[in-house]
């Protein structure tokens, strides 16, 4: 399963580990993904989403129905 937020689209980033001696080695910065279930009152069922903490804040701000309609318009669900 891809490490991508279904709401915000955040993906892993690539960067460097930097030691005290300034040696650099490649690393990945992973998004803070959480599996969450949301009760959708209009559909009378649970929806499972894999999203980041930022995605949770978007749902808190806009509501689950608005976010789901946006996801369906993009073809995510």
UniProtKB/Swiss-Prot annotation:
Kindly list the GO molecular function terms attached to this UniProt entry.
Answer: structural constituent of ribosome
Q: Which one Pfam family would you cite for this protein?
A: Ribosomal_L28
Biological process terms from the Gene Ontology for this record are: translation
Q: Which domain of life is it from?
A: Bacteria
Gene3D superfamilies from the UniProt entry: Ribosomal protein L28/L24 (2.30.170.40)
Does Heme appear among the keywords?
no
* InterPro entries xrefs: Ribosomal_bL28, Ribosomal_bL28/bL31-like_sf, Ribosomal_bL28_bact-type, Ribosomal_bL28_sf
What UniProt keywords apply to this chain's record, in alphabetical order? Ribonucleoprotein, Ribosomal protein
Q: Which SUPFAM superfamilies match?
A: L28p-like
Gene Ontology cellular component list: cytosolic large ribosomal subunit
Extract the PANTHER family matched here: 39S RIBOSOMAL PROTEIN L28, MITOCHONDRIAL, LARGE RIBOSOMAL SUBUNIT PROTEIN BL28M
Family the UniProt entry places it in: Belongs to the bacterial ribosomal protein bL28 family.
What is the recorded name of this protein?
Answer: Large ribosomal subunit protein bL28
Q: What species is this protein from? A: Polynucleobacter asymbioticus (strain DSM 18221 / CIP 109841 / QLW-P1DMWA-1)
């Amino acid at each position: 399963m891809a490490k991508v937020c279904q709401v915000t689209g955040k993906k892993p980033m690539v960067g460097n580990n930097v030691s005290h001696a300034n040696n650099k080695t490649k690393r990945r910065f992973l998004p803070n993904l959480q599996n969450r279930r949301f009760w959708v009152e209009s559909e009378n069922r649970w929806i499972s989403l894999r999203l980041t903490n930022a995605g949770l804040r978007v749902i808190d701000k806009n509501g689950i129905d608005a976010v789901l309609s946006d996801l369906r318009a993009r073809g995510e669900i």
